[in-house]
Amino acid sequence: MTVGRRLNDEEAIPLTAKEAGSRDSIDSSSTASVSLTLVDGTNHTTAKPSKSAHKGVSRDRYADEKYRDDVEEDWEEDRYIPSNAKPSQRRTQIVFWLLVALCVGGWAVAFLFFVTSPGNTISTTPDTGSGSPDSDVIKPGSPPAGKKIPLDDVLGGAWSPTQHTISWIAGPKGEDGLLLQKSEGGTGPYLHVEDVRNIHGTQSNNKSMVLMKDSVFFVNDERISPEKVWPSPDLKTVLAMTRQKKNWRHSYTGLYWLFDVETQTAQPLDPGAPNGRIQLATWSPTSDAVAFTRDNNLYIRNLTSKTVKAITTDGGANLFYGIPDWVYEEEVFEGNSATWWSLDGKYISFLRTNETTVPEFPVDFYLSSPPDYAPKPGEEAYPYVQQIKYPKAGAPNPTVGLQFYDVEREESFSVDVKDSLNDDDRIIIEVIPGSNGRILVRETNRESYIVKVAAIDATKREGKIIRSDNIDEIDGGWVEPSHTTTYIPSDPASGRPNDGYIDTVIHEGYNHLAYFTPLENPKPKMLTTGKWEVVAAPSGVDLKNNVIYFVATKESPIDRHVYSVKLDGSELQLLKDSEKSAYYDVSFSHGAGYMLLQYQGPKIPWQKLMNSPSNTDSYTEILEENKRLAKLSNEFALPSLHYSSITVDGFKLPVVERRPPNFDETKKYPVLFHLYGGPGSQTVNKKFLVNFQTYVASTLGYIVVTVDGRGTGFNGRKFRCIVRRNLGHYEAYDQIQTAKAWGRKPYVDKTRIAIWGWSYGGFMTLKTLEQDAGETFQYGMAVAPVTDWRYYDSIYTERYMHMPQNNEEGYETASVSNSTALSQNTRFLIMHGSADDNVHFQNTLTLLDKLDIMGVHNYDMHVFPDSNHGIYFHHAYKMVHQRLSDWLVNAFNGEWVRLRDPKPTIIKRVIRRLLHR
């Protein structure tokens, strides 16, 4: 599941997220991106703290209300007094003295409450239990007396690390270590290729090549400013796109142009339809053709002529060629492409998606509509309705099939694969082009526990299943879509007599790298083993030296380090000079001779370019040190992070506790639990991150705890797969048990514990409140929650729950339906965007109806008109977080306790009578 992702919004990560920073149905990156190179949509954030950070507006807002509830005084002015009322002097005096008496009495009660309340008793007993969070403590460099963090700074990206995204590119003759760079400042050529060792362009280098001198070009006197560009593999032509128009999370349309590097001139990709909006365009590996999809049909343009040939002609509202539909884009490919060229450029593989039987779901827009939408006369007052083909759990899925196009013969064909899954039970999750017309296809059944790998020979037009696994029989789990399977071509001179591929497989209860060779061999050579897991591997492959690079959790499930291993499984090595407790990421050049190493935490992030271990040409350059962020960290008071674990039912759960600056163990603190909790996700890690949770601890002065319960990732398959068929049960139990443990700590006020989450985290918030029934958690805040998995999309839901037809009891149990249990909590908050195309507003409305039926009213509700799952429309994103902050302060100040059973007081009635005489 995904949501549009913004800066520092791991609380809103998509349901499909594999780990906190990887993606958002809430989009990801949690960092600002500064691009020296060309990436899709470059971005440079140089945000500074808002003025309020220096004026201290937010700093003291709740300074007197951090650790105790205010006692409510019932002597407010009666708002129903008529504006022209004139009470006598005697009555006024009576009222005055009554008010004075009430004030004195109220203060006395408040003082008595403060000194006797169990939430304010002073404890001198230190926390020395086995679950002490002091086992791994990260304290910021800032002084505890530093400034508090304004919420606007967090939401605005001032605390986002500056991050450079490198666009590695292979040279025309396979040269390694080349970058694609774009100059935004008007100095130097607009688009050029540079050697990584000359990234700043200060040296003369024969590998440098100018592709586009200027940032604009003209076609028939029309001024063109490219928004995205893709050079051909031979670097002689640039495919440029303008007038981008967003579709779904990853997809868009635009006008495409072919720019000739030698003449610096351009022409439309399709001269016959220059204004036709194209959905996808991809280069042939031989640079002589472009395949593209327009109006859901696939075309090919050969650069030697200006003619365009249609590969398909029946595409339309229900048939897609070469691009995914909504659910495949969202849950399978996580991108906009379903077109793959063979490595020799002779064949095109493309997906045919048929949505005819998929039901539609209407999304209403009350305040907005597409720019080209014009209502019929007299219908201006009606909402714009967007119909989405959205397969919910148990409903018909789109049927998909892989088709092929022979470029030389100009003909399309299909390949029958014996023992392949049936059309109505197939999800194609990955297509891997190989050499000599070979293609690997990974497919799963609808419930994602059968995985098959087919090898197809497009030249012979035949294929067969070369591998089949039943995950249900292995560990009762499921298969996640992945896009990292890597084809390894044969090279006898380098010790590779046969073609093969590297895949991530289940080995002794953990995800590990395996090398399958020859191609048809179902029994692999294990490249990694142990009680740890590889992450989106491999990251790079050095075919010259037979070295594989990957990121893994070998040091700790919450750390990430870079490793290398030989293709024969020998010489597993940690990257030299790596810090023991750290979170690294890496991207490699085309031949894996160079890499961009990214240190992402726990200290201030940095980036550097360097040669890979298998490259003897030594090179290192610091690309980013984030000095601005280091300066901020020394000016503002950040919470300290205390990493630990808690054992529940024999499972060791990772925990991070954020303690406020100036933390005092003799005081009692409220605690906010924040969670996501989706299958395979991870929220507890060693990344540097200043987000809403940081703000709550730093500025509001509350403790914030996050625990990754069962079902989350990187702790082994047993830990992850226990939630199969029963989402919400074990995850909620783990949150409750952790909260109980924290409630026993001497510095925690167990009468003030809250929980909150977004998307899957919103679902988990409500399930936790439901299962706990007010025993441990008093408050909860759920944003865009799933409340019934029958309402969510089929591919995601059935992967973990099976189809409703095969797990009716599980779906019933997993729904948020126990209104009586929810009524036992002090109060909870629900927020949702009305135009959420991912987690439909239907989820929240259904829950509200259940609450109405049972007469439950201890909740607040906020609807954001026309906002999708990310909740942005009309400044809604800021409103969400401000509402969360204010609501939480009111909760911990005791406001919701007062509202739980509202009754007029005798004193108010007496005052009302006196004033109305």
Curated annotation (Swiss-Prot):
Feature: compositional bias, Polar residues: 40-49, 124-133
EC number: 3.4.14.5
Region (Disordered): 1-75, 124-150
Any one of the GO BP annotations: proteolysis
Keyword line: Aminopeptidase, Glycoprotein, Hydrolase, Membrane, Protease, Serine protease, Signal-anchor, Transmembrane, Transmembrane helix, Vacuole
Xref: InterPro entries: AB_hydrolase_fold, Peptidase_S9_cat, Peptidase_S9B_N, Serine_Prot_S9B/DPPIV
Reaction(s) the record says it catalyses: Release of an N-terminal dipeptide, Xaa-Yaa-|-Zaa-, from a polypeptide, preferentially when Yaa is Pro, provided Zaa is neither Pro nor hydroxyproline
Assigned protein family: Belongs to the peptidase S9B family.
Identification of the protein by name: Probable dipeptidyl-aminopeptidase B
Organism (species): Arthroderma gypseum (strain ATCC MYA-4604 / CBS 118893)
Gene: DAPB
